[in-house]
Amino acid sequence: MQYHVFATDFDGTLSHDGVVSSETIEALKRLADSGRKIVLVTGREMYSLKNTFPMIDLFHWIVAENGGVIFDTSSGNEIVLSDPPPTIFVDELVRRGVKGISVGKCVVATWTPFENIVLDSIRDLGLELTVVFNKGAVMVLPPDINKATGLQRVLLEMGLSVHNTVGVGDAENDHAFLKVCEFSAATANALPSLKASVDLVLKKDHGAGVVELIDRLLADDLQSYRTQRNNALVIGTSDDGPVLLHTFGDPMLICGASGSGKSTLANKIADVLTESAYQFCLVDPEGDFESFPGAIVLGGPNAAPQLDELMHALEQPGSNVVACLTGISIPDRPEFFLRLLGSLNQLRARTGRPHWLILDEAHHLMPVDWQPPAELLPEDWFNVVLITVNPDSLPLMVLNRVSIVTIVGSDANETLQAFGSATKKVVPLLPPPVLTTGEVWQWNLIDSVTPIRYNAMKSTREHTRHRRKYAEGQLAPEKSFYFRGPNGNLNLRAQNLILFCQIAEGIDDETWLYHLRRNDFACWFRDIINDENLAAEAELAAMDADLTATLSKSQIVAAIQRNYILLSSSRISVPGAM
């Protein structure tokens, strides 16, 4: 379920001339029975609302006085969000003959045609106040108070997000709160300016329009209107225009060879989610996202992330969380992910958050023989990004839930064919030329027959591969370096650069020079560590026939120490160094 909160205006929306129909009341009860929270967002003061509509327990929270006061109906707790109106201002309105003045805990209200006197009084007194119109009503508030700020404070109190909120209104003062809602609607009697700014204009007016919206929400969580919303996020550009990431979308698979741009695209997705305040949880087996700006990073090479700490961090709607698994051995990662996935499913069922789940190196979490309990992997697994090298490294039950296949790298056709072979799906042949740096193929299995080729937008944040991963992390066996020697008598595995240096210190000269002269070190540094400079250093050492084993070890290990080990907490000795 995407929408957990229903926010509605009162006068002119829920009610008609202050009266809420029995049909509207029944619809609100049905909505509450679905587990959703209902928030009333009104310009009225609490006493006025209670006198007009005593059934306030239909709502979980009330935003009153146009955002100045919030009220928890279950506890009766009222929170005033600003200072009271200046007495000098109220006195001046009375002195100038303004009629129908109502003074609340934050708001001063009157009616037209006194708006000009109100504006003149604010100017003449030199006050910083905001005038808000609600059809015939004229409301004066502190400059930082409106229906949007009140709604956002209520959502914070409930631990929920505007991105899981549907809003409906009819008048000028509804613009602010409808703008922050993920989905906005206007009743048929709404002002033209409001109708022009919302996602859906209802066919019916007042309470009947609210009932119409509730019925549609209960029918399919408004997913039939997904393509009509204006809040999709741009992640690239094609010849046909921008390429969009729908904020409530189908599972996406990003695949391609190492170094082909998977992490760059994933970083851009995390980037745009952050910029638009969509919460994500990124599971990072290899430490590629340890330094993502603004995210809470839990776990690392020396400590596994604790599940309770992860979930506590995610309870805050504004917190993005990276779960770094470099401190968990590769065989133990699927079990950890099973426990994490169960907790994430529960949080999503309760709040709709985290909005997105990004799984880097997904084959570490869900290997091909992975068999989770059926309830942990729902058929409608939404807002998930899976990142891997080869599609066939993931279990079929996961691949069958993928709706969008995104491919990077020069071997895109082979990668897409591998997806087809694994899923028994007929996949298209990608036309030439091969992809260049920054280009992406995307195939939508549901909506598009022909894949689209686009340029992925670069991240506005600098994302660097965290070097501690290679210094201290646990590389997979197939990515580790093996000292075997000229006769294959050894099989010493270095799954990170610290171990590489430690083994190098104790290895015999013949074995060291054997791998050096064959450029085995250079290939590992370039293809696995993704460090061209370190690879070049090893190649230069290999080309110098007069360089002894001791000196070449000293040079290469010193280069590793300069660029990697100093970033970690571990120490190593450098052969030949004092």
Locate the predicted segments by residue.
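Conserved H-loop
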Residues: 43-44, 285, 389-391, 410
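Terminal, compositionally biased segments used for targeting/anchoring and flexible tails
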Residues: 431-578
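P-loop NTPase catalytic phosphate-binding loop
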Residues: 229-356, 367-377, 382-385, 392-393, ...
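Conserved ATP-driven motor cores of ASCE-family P-loop NTPases powering translocation/secretion/packaging/pilus
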Residues: 390-446
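Conserved acidic, metal-coordinating active-site core of Asp-based
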Residues: 86-181, 189
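Active-site phosphate-binding/coordination module
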Residues: 17-103
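Mg2+-dependent phosphoryl-transfer enzymes with acidic/Ser/Thr/Gly-rich catalytic loops
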Residues: 1-3, 21, 141, 148-229
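Short, structured coil segments at secondary-structure junctions
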Residues: 55-58, 65-66, 125, 180-181, ...
